């Protein structure tokens, strides 16, 4: 039954699960990721957490269909409240906005020992996750950016460690926004994403610069100019 196929983004998340780990997948939807990880002997066991009835029942059905009831515990609850402290070696949260993932981590941080590996896949606004990890003194140990079905996704991997190590050679503000590992690698997906973002920011800047000359607009123009400068630096240098 290990023919379960994952999307490219979830496959990337799965690759970072430590071998033999007990994983907790928060917002597990159909529990594809924990089922795949256990079936392929990546994880020794898993917890699949879901808050709403539909996805919770879908996850239960998938675990049963995969014959994994003895290896995967499907639990209903909000965020990290589905796990006990120290119960999981790796925590995966995938397919949500960065602000929501950061909120889930903040709301459930009493469940974290600091020894877990966090594997986080935001659909947008990864900056919120990097800021949370830095605040809570987690070390970012790797990042991936990939494109699937015309959309860009990032995967962030963090563990306890030196929170500043990843940001060596890049300003903290730039690293938080675009990702320190991704900025060093600068692959085609990264350049496409941030070139488009720069063009979008320039377009907004031009629109506001033609609007009324208010203090609010002046402040906004300064923020946009700073952002454009930062993006140009990231795209053109290094």
From Swiss-Prot:
The modification Phosphoserine is found at residue 70. Keywords: Cytoplasm, Methyltransferase, Phosphoprotein, S-adenosyl-L-methionine, Transferase, tRNA processing. It is found in: Cytoplasm. One of its GO terms (molecular function) is tRNA (adenine(22)-N1)-methyltransferase activity. It is an enzyme of class 2 (transferase). Belongs to the TrmK family. It comes from the Bacteria. Catalyzes the S-adenosyl-L-methionine-dependent formation of N(1)-methyladenine at position 22 (m1A22) in tRNA. InterPro entries: SAM-dependent_MTases_sf, TrmK. This is tRNA (adenine(22)-N(1))-methyltransferase. The keyword Transferase applies. Signal peptide: none annotated. Transmembrane segments: none annotated. It catalyses: adenosine(22) in tRNA + S-adenosyl-L-methionine = N(1)-methyladenosine(22) in tRNA + S-adenosyl-L-homocysteine + H(+). GO terms for cellular component: cytoplasm. The gene is trmK. The keyword Ion transport does not apply.
């Amino acid at each position: 039954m290990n023919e379960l196929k994952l999307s490219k983004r979830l496959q990337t998340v799965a690759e970072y699960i430590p071998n033999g780990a007990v994983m907790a997948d928060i917002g597990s939807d159909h529990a594809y990721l924990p089922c795949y990880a256990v079936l392929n002997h990546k994880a020794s066991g898993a917890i699949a957490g879901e808050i709403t009835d539909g996805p919770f029942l879908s996850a239960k059905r998938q675990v049963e269909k995969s014959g994994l009831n003895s290896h995967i515990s499907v639990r209903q609850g909000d965020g990290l409240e589905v796990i006990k402290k120290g119960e999981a070696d790796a925590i995966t949260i995938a397919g949500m906005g960065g602000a929501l993932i950061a909120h889930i981590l903040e709301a459930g941080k009493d469940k974290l020992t600091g020894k877990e590996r966090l594997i986080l896949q935001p659909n947008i606004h990864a900056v919120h996750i990097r800021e949370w990890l830095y605040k809570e003194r987690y070390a970012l140990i790797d990042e991936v950016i990939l494109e699937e079905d015309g959309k860009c996704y990032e995967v962030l991997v963090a563990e306890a460690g030196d929170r500043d190590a990843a940001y060596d050679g890049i300003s903290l503000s730039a690293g938080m926004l675009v990702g320190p590992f991704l900025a060093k690698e600068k692959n085609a997906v990264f350049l496409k994403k941030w070139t488009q973002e720069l063009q979008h920011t320039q377009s907004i800047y031009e629109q506001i610069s033609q609007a009324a000359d208010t203090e609010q607009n002046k402040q906004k123009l300064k923020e946009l100019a700073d952002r454009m400068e930062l993006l140009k630096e990231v795209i053109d240098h290094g």
